[in-house]
Amino acid sequence: MVPGWRSSLVILAALAWASTTGPLKPFRQALTTVEPPQRILVLGGDLDRERVGLRLAQQLELPLVVSGGSNPEYAQWLLRDAGIDQSRVVLDYRAKDTFTNFTSLVDDLKRDGVRHVYLVTSEDHLPRAMTVGRLVAGSRGIRLTGVPVACQPSCRKEALGKRLGDGMRALAWVITGRDLKPWALRNW
């Protein structure tokens, strides 16, 4: 026999358990879902993102969630101007950053039975948003499909450290259910 075959078998069995009934099951479900998107999630912070989200909502007749977007008065004006029924739109102002865009909404989406979401954000922000979103939303079995919004000529490539930092923050949230950033800032 090949040395170490027993430990390899144990590792394979543990991975099989983790991805079928264990803690990785929601991630597997999110990655394998074939359902069409059921919501459009716009990460606020840029008016072009909101406009693209509104156009998608009109074209696809999907509900729209804007997280941390423009002020409520301007957002309401955009909705009226686009002719979108306000009952199809949620304006959510709980988020303070990319991480909380997801953590403040993911349980609401899961409760509503949402399994697949179009994620609208600027093309330079999309890689970090997808890193955080895949972890946070994936932990609830929700798949994300990114919709990049052109940001030329004002695009600025985000630093890899920022993406990794937010990714670690999201992973810690998935494991503990808490945002550990305040604790880390106090203790490091």
Stretch-by-stretch model annotation:
Residues 16, 24-25, 166-170:
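N-terminal membrane-anchoring/stem segments of glycan-assembly enzymes
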Residues 5, 186-188:
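Non-catalytic accessory segments flanking enzymatic or RNA/DNA-binding domains
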Residues 156-183:
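A transmembrane-helix-recognition feature enriched in membrane-embedded lipid enzymes
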Residues 4-22:
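Hydrophobic membrane-insertion alpha-helices, especially the h-region
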Residues 21-163:
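A structural signal for short, hydrophobic/glycine-enriched beta-strand patches
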